[in-house]
Regions:
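Acidic/polar, low-complexity intrinsically disordered N-terminal segments immediately downstream
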Residues: 4, 21-159, 312-317
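Ser/Thr/Gly/Pro-rich, low-complexity flexible regions
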Residues: 143-317
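C-terminal motif of bacterial Sec signal peptides marking the signal peptidase cleavage site
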Residues: 16-19
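Bacterial N-terminal signal peptides that target proteins for export
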Residues: 1-8
Length: 317
């Protein structure tokens, strides 16, 4: 039987973040010409679109100020790098619609290469006094994931609720990719498996405290982004339920809080081949416990990118 070990006070802070392109020209909102709908692109002038392998299209959003009547805008391609992109020549709004989607296809794009697309809007419903951009530059890439072999994940989140050993290593197969702003690692959730064996360095091939009834069928992937700020675990479902609903977790900073001093990001040590999430860096939640409240974790979590890195960490303890 599993017993709840700690219950922290509930912590939920909504994060609202906005970003802008400091190099892009800004428009000053003025009075639109009579009858002009003020159609423009939503978002920044320069946008980055990164998709997973197998995805060969993406959507851009157009918006407008006047929505009473239907409207149409012309789309002109200014730059189509290597003729990768297929774009519609017009985008239409139905009466009452505030936004519309422009779907761009890139059927021949190769993985790991960034392609640039520049578009411009024109027509009677485009105004110099609208609030957004009439032109847009999009850098599009299909991520290229490469295996870097077996690593070891030591979890400090589940022990926030239950009396389990946070130093148990779980063997995970790690993939790596490089994005426009980060180095990214991913691996299948070890919690969605029952451990049946250990490898030569002691890593379990699943979570050793699981029974078959604890597993929630599905695909669950841990994704860690490393930027100049630090390492961040994207919100993830574990694929495990110990009677209080699905476990989930992620980084506190950027998801629940903007206070990086109280809730630090993880530390990527490239030389040591490790990522350390210190105390209060990650949160954990169970869907049916306290309305799914998210709790910062007092125990650290570690990802070692190789067996050598994990064994070296044992020698330095």
């Amino acid at each position: 039987m599993k017993y709840i070990n700690k219950i922290l006070s509930l912590f939920v802070i909504a994060l609202i973040a906005t970003s802008c392109d400091p190099d892009a020209e800004s428009y000053t909102l003025g009075e639109l010409e009579d009858g002009n709908q003020g159609i423009c692109f939503a978002g920044n002038y320069t946008q980055t679109v990164e998709v997973e392998p197998g995805i060969t299209s993406f959507d851009l959003t157009l918006t407008r100020a006047l929505t009473d009547a239907a409207g149409t805008v012309d789309v002109t391609v200014i730059n189509n790098e290597k003729n990768i992109f297929v774009c519609p020549s017009t985008v239409s709004f139905a009466a009452g619609e505030k936004t519309a989607k422009l779907t761009v296809e890139a059927p021949s794009a190769a993985e790991g290469i960034t392609y640039n697309l520049q578009l411009a809007l024109s027509g009677n419903d485009v105004s110099n006094y609208s609030s957004g951009y009439h032109e847009i530059s999009v850098n599009f890439a299909i991520l290229k994931w490469e295996s870097i072999g077996t690593g070891y994940y030591l979890d400090g989140t589940v022990s926030n609720f239950f009396k389990v050993d946070p130093s148990v290593p779980m063997a995970v197969e790690i993939e790596k990719t490089t994005t426009a702003t980060s180095t990214r690692f991913r691996f299948d959730s070890p919690f969605a498996k029952v451990a049946t064996a250990q490898d030569e360095v002691g890593g379990f091939n699943g979570y050793p405290f699981n029974a078959e009834a604890d597993i929630v069928p599905g695909e669950y992937t841990f994704v860690i982004d490393v930027t100049k700020e630090g390492a961040s675990l994207k919100p993830v479902q574990y694929g495990m339920d110990w009677g209080y609903g699905m476990f989930s977790g992620g980084s506190v900073y950027g998801n629940l809080s903007t206070n990086i001093n109280s809730y630090p990001l993880g530390v990527y040590n490239e030389k040591a081949g490790s990522i350390t999430f210190p105390a209060n860096s990650l949160y954990v939640s169970m869907a049916d416990y306290q309305d799914g409240g998210a709790y910062p974790c007092t125990n650290p979590s570690y990802l070692y990118l190789s067996a050598e890195a994990y064994l070296n960490s044992l020698e330095t303890e």
